[in-house]
Swiss-Prot record:
Function of the protein: Catalyzes the phosphorylation of methylthioribose into methylthioribose-1-phosphate.
Entry protein name: Methylthioribose kinase
Organism the protein comes from: Bacillus cereus (strain AH187)
Binding annotation for substrate: D225, R332
Catalytic activity: 5-(methylsulfanyl)-D-ribose + ATP = 5-(methylsulfanyl)-alpha-D-ribose 1-phosphate + ADP + H(+)
Amino acid sequence: MGYYSLTEVTAVQYAKEHGYFEKKANVVCHEIGDGNLNYVFKLDDGEKSIIIKQALPYAKVVGESWPLSIKRATIESKALQIFAKYVPEYVPVVYSHDEELAVTIIEDLSKLTITRKGLIDGEEYPLLSQHIGRFLANVLFYTSDFGLQSEEKRVLEGTFVNPDLCKITEDLVFTDPFGHYDTNDYESELQLAVDELWSDKTLKLKVAQYKYKFLTRKEALIHGDLHTGSIFSSPSETKVIDPEFATYGPFGFDIGQFIANLLLNALSREEEQRSVLFFHIEKTWSYFVDTFTKLWIGEGVEAYTKEKQWLPIILQNIFTDVVGFAGCELIRRTIGLAHVADLDEIANKETRIQAKKQALSLGRELIKYESKNADIQLFRALFQQTVSGGVKA
């Protein structure tokens, strides 16, 4: 029959045909997706519920003028299954995948809350940083040359060639926000700050280096889009979703994106409400380092993991990348194509513009920072310096 887009009616038919519900069951279906690339349906018969996710052959945020391969759905399904191999407690269960229709049927997580929404609403997730730090350490270690035999790693890397979505990252994270491109989207009040950003040659040289790292460093399997909208949370649970951008890339990319989105939320808050975000930033890194170190010592398969002086070098290199990638994410989420509600939903316009100027300023500082021998306290220090020092009008 070939590919066709599901509707709420045909999603129910599909689920029944594949044995998820009885033929006569009264199944309620709603399209609940709020992302840019897919349809997401929730199906519920009163006794059980499932999620059907279907990749569209174009970017929903733009329309059919931006075609995308539906093979990304297979990438996402495979990534979730790889993640589940190492940290099943932090990902939804994948029930099945239909490559022809680009349909994946997964566990319903609606008892949890999208982390971005929860943080905006002032919810606290005490285990968020512990869970994300451990998730990242396990996935990154076990899919790298340190935790996987080199032959196996090369084979696995070949299954995550993801050109369409990697091109989106290359453009929307590393290129477009730093120059005159039609994809950029920002308020006129930011124009002076944007002009200053675009004329900063030192900044552009650093961004070029981070883009090159993303293009060439195939260190481990990365989620590729690990922001707070790609995580479900409750006070006791954390689930990572939507790894359709998964590919082999730099160790520090996912960590940097996650930290940047915590910083964006911090910028949207009053000063006295920010401490929990810095707690999570610092604990994410400390749990990552602790877990990665234990795996390195106990599970390392690469001969040189026995060299005690190598691990600190690896961790410092990762941290350097975390800082720069976080800076790029701050800027792209402020003036690029895909904004975040943390900033865009600040009700007072003057406050919103000020927060966005601060995001641009902080992003620049992070990208340009020479972070040799720096530690995770850097984020708190640069944030306080940027916000308390104000920004140029």
